[in-house]
Amino acid sequence: MKIKSILAATAMVAAINSQAQGIQYFIAQNPEIDLSELTVDKDGYYELFNGKDLKGWRGYGKDHVPSKWNIKDGALHFNGQGEGEGGDIIFTHQFQNFIFELEWKISEGGNSGIFYLAKETATLEPAKTETKEFKDGPVSAVVTVNKDAKLNYQPIYISCPECQVLDNERHPDAKLGATLGIRQSTSLYDMIVAKPQNAKPAGEWNKVKITVKNGKVTHYQNDVKVLSYQLWGQEWIDLLQSSKFSEKNWPLAFQLLKNCGGDDKKGYFGFQDHGDEVWYRNIRVKVIK
């Protein structure tokens, strides 16, 4: 997906929010993979990754998978130390009510994240005219420079909840945030601590399950329920206001997260490039009514 194609898309939804310091933002509506193209396993889950190819995946705000994401030993792998193009990735189908399961393994000192109900969001830097004065010895001139409008993608994590992926023993985020543990693995990043904290250490596989049903969200880590919360009501607003995404600290993030999933209350799954090596496997989802 190229920027010019987004600007031309007739399905784009535009909104202006005075609460976000007058910033105009756009939510791109792009082609999605049809679920009929996916394998359904014996438990009724759609397989989002088959361990062989990256069908259905692409970079956030891109029309391809960045080269640092690859397949290694049957797992979806991010090569944090390697050369090439990085960036977050998404699975190109939006889900509303679901049971989402996967396993992750993080490198020593590593950090990543699992996104759900994500939207591709961009802000428009308007066209403008600048007048500049140039001098070269006795010669001077006033030149008018026109700058075209520019579309800037905003970080995926300001549009949706994030389930943290972290080496709790070594990464400094494990001790940051308003409450100890609020940025540790499987927490609702910077909002709710995962209790009990039963993550396995770096280099070992951890199992995560995330359920969403009419805005009721639950995180499970290694088959244990660790947190639950309700989207789109006062509880959600209070969580946002007590986090780094508060209306005061980050108006655009607050506006987008307050209405995460958009008017249709659905969005993409995604994985974060935080610069560290990470692996994901057994990625599957069951659609629930």
For the regions a protein language model found, what residue spans apply to each?
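Carbohydrate-interacting regions of secretory-pathway proteins
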Residues: Q21-K289
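Bacterial Sec-dependent N-terminal signal peptides
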Residues: M1-G22
